[in-house]
């Protein structure tokens, strides 16, 4: 397999006080959320604290103390026991990946009544409304105001850049940015840095951004989330691949090849499926969109047993993505389709309406996706889709406000992994998961 450059290390953090509940430029097509101010009567309930095995070792969580009187044999026995417990703990938490660590965001306080500009990827999906809700609630708690904007479509990169420029001209205390493109915003980011305005990324990072311009990111570890989806998918597909006489095709639907979050969810899924299939002795290849073919770890090969077929529409529209789904469903060797966000998941449901090929039966095409919303939740519940990865969008919105406030205070900030969970019809009503499934 091709070697993949290591991604940025995300510092784990503790998120407390977050609870799931729920514009500027006249020349750009945009949706706008009104600025919000303090409301001292509102409180935020305490969230669940979860600690990663890696953070336990590096940051001193649950460290075991050893006395000098312990013999070498006792120490070795203790190490073996601790390692086994850590492995078991890691396995038990594999389906619920949430954040924890060294920065307690629940203790953030604003030194002044700051104003923030936040430029989102858009409002065309309920996901962004959930992020907005979290941001509004936390802004009210901290006594700061914000202006939350985004383009009408996640294809409107130029509109988003214009909104970012308008945000800079407003001279806020800090700016939140969910970048649609990993390079289109770089000039504006440099301008913000020169003006002394810190930028906090959310949902997507901005690889290649001018050094020091983006001070932190609040996002899911998207590559790891794609891997999680692949692991759960391969558990179901393993026997079908083994039983197939010829090649099998796994479709990968991405709404674009420009957003870091979408790309990494796709690559995480592709690379992990390839790793698992190759471990079982199968050959794997990737075809379709050039970006994913070139950036995946998979070496192209002829006559592969497992074909990962990546479909990306020319524009981010429901119609084009539904057509991509139908094209994949109509290929005789397709056994699965994975959609890497709410847009793609809903397009899968739409594309399947006339064909009725998605499902968990042996002669059906397995469907897995990302996020939630009414359409996806119902499709998982009724078996059209097997499962999905949910993020924590309300917690993400709150974390953005916390990081913006810390940056405006002049405090040290760090990346926040807002976590992800795998859900199916069997566990989607569990309290820990249901709180992250928005309508």
Predicted regions and their residues:
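C-terminal motif of bacterial Sec signal peptides marking the signal peptidase cleavage site
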Residues: 18-22
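Bacterial N-terminal signal peptides that target proteins for export
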Residues: 1-10
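A residue-level marker of the well-folded mature domains of exported/periplasmic proteins
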Residues: 2, 24-439
């Amino acid at each position: 397999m091709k070697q993949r450059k290591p991604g940025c290390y995300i510092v784990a953090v503790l998120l407390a006080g977050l609870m799931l509940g729920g514009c500027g430029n006249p020349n750009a097509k945009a949706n706008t959320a009104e600025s919000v101010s303090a409301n001292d009567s509102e409180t935020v309930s305490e969230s669940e604290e979860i600690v990663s095995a890696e953070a336990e070792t590096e940051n001193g969580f649950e460290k075991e103390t050893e006395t000098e009187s312990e013999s070498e044999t006792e120490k070795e026995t203790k190490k073996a026991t601790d390692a086994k417990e850590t492995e078991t703990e890691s396995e038990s938490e594999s389906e619920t990946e949430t954040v924890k660590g060294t920065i307690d965001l629940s203790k953030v306080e604003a030194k002044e009544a700051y104003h923030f500009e936040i430029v989102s990827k858009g409002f065309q999906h309920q996901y962004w409304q959930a992020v907005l809700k979290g941001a509004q609630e936390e802004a009210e708690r901290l006594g700061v105001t914000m202006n939350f904007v985004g383009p009408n479509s996640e294809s409107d990169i130029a509109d988003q850049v214009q909104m970012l420029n308008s945000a800079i001209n407003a001279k806020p205390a800090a700016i939140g940015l969910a970048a649609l493109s990993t390079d289109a915003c770089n000039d504006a980011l440099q301008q913000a840095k020169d003006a002394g305005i810190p930028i906090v990324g959310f949902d997507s990072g901005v690889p290649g951004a001018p050094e020091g311009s983006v001070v932190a990111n609040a996002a899911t570890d998207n590559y790891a989330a794609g891997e999680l989806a692949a692991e759960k998918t391969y558990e179901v597909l393993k026997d079908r691949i083994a039983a197939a006489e010829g090649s099998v095709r796994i479709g990968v639907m991405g709404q674009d090849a420009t957003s870091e979050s979408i790309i990494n969810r796709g690559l995480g899924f592709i690379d992990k499926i390839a790793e698992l299939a190759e471990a079982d002795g199968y050959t794997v290849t990737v075809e379709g969109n050039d970006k994913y073919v070139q950036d995946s770890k998979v070496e192209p090969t002829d006559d592969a047993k497992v074909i990962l077929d990546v479909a990306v529409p020319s524009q981010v529209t429901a119609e084009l993505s539904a057509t991509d789904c139908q094209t994949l469903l109509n290929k005789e060797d397709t056994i699965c389709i994975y959609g890497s966000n709410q847009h793609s998941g809903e397009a899968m449901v739409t594309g399947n309406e006339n064909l009725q090929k998605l499902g968990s039966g042996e002669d059906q095409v397995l469907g897995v996706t990302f996020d939630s919303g009414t359409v996806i939740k119902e499709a998982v519940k009724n078996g059209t889709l097997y499962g999905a990865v949910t993020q924590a969008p309300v917690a993400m919105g709150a974390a953005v406000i916390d990081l913006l406030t810390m940056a405006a205070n002049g405090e040290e900030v760090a990346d926040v992994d807002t976590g992800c969970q795998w859900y199916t019809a069997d566990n989607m009503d569990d309290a820990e998961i249901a709180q992250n499934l928005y309508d």
